């Protein structure tokens, strides 16, 4: 019987390092189209490869299931609760920045986000999901990270913090160590991203949001 081989977890597998990006994207200056408000999509379209890999498959994935998959691929379910929450918030805010700015659609692609760690987060088709992560996502899935007077969710980047160092980004192992010391979720996030980082909440909509003509944003 054929058995699917699940790729390695990012904390011990060999994956490309994240290519640094600005955490706040310029909008409206060179024709980019963005959503009118921050929303939580019902679905995202995941391109299972690098953006330019035309052979990679696109998957329609429920937003919550996507976040659960990424979190289970990026961190360990045995970590302290505040570290799990901090990492999930960073994953969600990064993802919602891609949604809000229509980052890939503005580049001519028909997907929301990729599974390449060089560009986005690790998403593994068909992987197992851990309860401790699943429960947190179900509780806080409408949240994202914001800064004062910035409309878009912050593109909160991170790295493992052991094999790779990333100043001004969150260290995944470092977040676990801070949680072990009793840091709260927001204290962990502010330790890495600065004191003007806040947790915000958006409304959930049905379907896949788009600013292009022919689509309506409906509240789910």
List PLM regions with ranges.
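Conserved, single-site charged/polar hotspot
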Residues: 3-220
